[in-house]
Amino acid sequence: MKVQLNIRDYLDRAVAVYGDRVGVIDEPDQPAPSLGSLTYSEIGDHAKALAAGLDALGVGPGERVAVVSQNSARLLIAFFGVSGWGRVLVPINFRLHAEEIRYIVQHSGATVFLIDPELAVDLDDIDCQHKFVIG
């Protein structure tokens, strides 16, 4: 019996088997707006939407997408939406200083930079081909 074990397969299985169950509860007291409770189906929908957005930008498989986010539903969605469709996620610790984050973004080869809303002002001057505030 062949069992797929890639990231996309885990998401697809969770959506198929547990679709209506709660998959994540976002912290209500975080600095960025909370996404509340999301079912596995909703996580899958958000991940597909992110992947479609990256497709529309022309970001192909193997290209890097940097994300700086607290441990949140947004980070989980980025994990599946980026890695599940063949791109490389570059997770960056939100506790780093802006100069450290700039270094990682510039030296990672990321063409897309996803930023949590509460960090956007501090990271506004970091250059990347595509930069988006998530959430």
List each language-model region with its residue ranges:
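Residue-level marker of alpha-helix boundaries and capping positions
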Residues: 1-2, 41, 69, 92
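Structural core segment of the AMP-binding/adenylate-forming
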Residues: 2, 10-12, 56-57, 84-135
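A short N-terminal helical cap/helix-turn-helix that marks the beginning
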Residues: 2-25
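Residue-level recognition of oxygen-bearing side chains
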Residues: 6, 49, 74, 109, ...
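Residue-level signal for pocket-adjacent positions within structured domains
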Residues: 19, 33, 87-91
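A structure-centric signal for secondary-structure junctions around beta-strands
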Residues: 19-21, 62, 128
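Conserved AMP-binding/adenylate-forming core of the ANL superfamily
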Residues: 23-72, 76-80, 97-102
